[in-house]
Amino acid sequence: MNPVSLIFLAFAMSTDAFAAAIGKGSSLDRPRLSEALRTGIIFGVIEAITPLVGWLLGQAASQFVADWDHWIAFVLLVLLGLHMIHNGLRADHETEQEKPGQHSFWILAVTALATSIDALAVGVGLAFVDVNIFLAAGAIGLATMTMVTLGTMLGRALGAVTGKRAEMVGGVVLILVGATILYEHLSAA
């Protein structure tokens, strides 16, 4: 995977966490930088671990699917991208509102895990392409930490405007990364 695709992948993986962080930030009266950084670190670490787990699962299966691995990566990324676009187009979910300032570690960790399931699937797909998984996981974690920290700080102002659009943009980027992987493999053959 080329460096530009890796950067796009990292930021695409962070968009759903960014949208969640905007929601978290909007529930705080005045988000403090320390709270935003804490939230960003929790999300970033979890988002970096999940593609590693997915990659390990993909590696275990890679010997059985080596001839069509690029198609698996492509299909997974396109399906995840379409899912993110669909979620971005849907009406807001009815969610249980937290009280301001009630962002415990466990609430943040569960939210981070929920938004990182797509990174697990991407990790499975990355097992079938030429990529340094530790570099990819680190990039995904760093991008997520950055985007979540910003999303938490900007949540109050941007919550109503950006949340759904960020998820849709992330979905489009995932589809483009999947198409790039497929193109690179087919053009090399």
Curated annotation (Swiss-Prot):
Entry's Gene Ontology molecular function annotations: manganese ion transmembrane transporter activity
Segments traversing the membrane: 3-23, 41-61, 65-85, 106-128, 141-161, 168-188
Entry keyword Transcription: no
Pfam families: Mntp (PF02659)
Organism: Pseudomonas aeruginosa (strain LESB58)
Stated name of the protein: Putative manganese efflux pump MntP
Taxonomic lineage of the native organism: Bacteria, Pseudomonadati, Pseudomonadota, Gammaproteobacteria, Pseudomonadales
Main subcellular location of this protein, as a coarse class: membrane
Membrane disposition: Multi-pass membrane protein
Location in the cell: Cell inner membrane
Function: Probably functions as a manganese efflux pump.
Keywords: Cell inner membrane, Cell membrane, Ion transport, Manganese, Membrane, Transmembrane, Transmembrane helix, Transport
Gene: mntP
Family designation: Belongs to the MntP (TC 9.B.29) family.
A GO cellular-component term linked to this record: plasma membrane
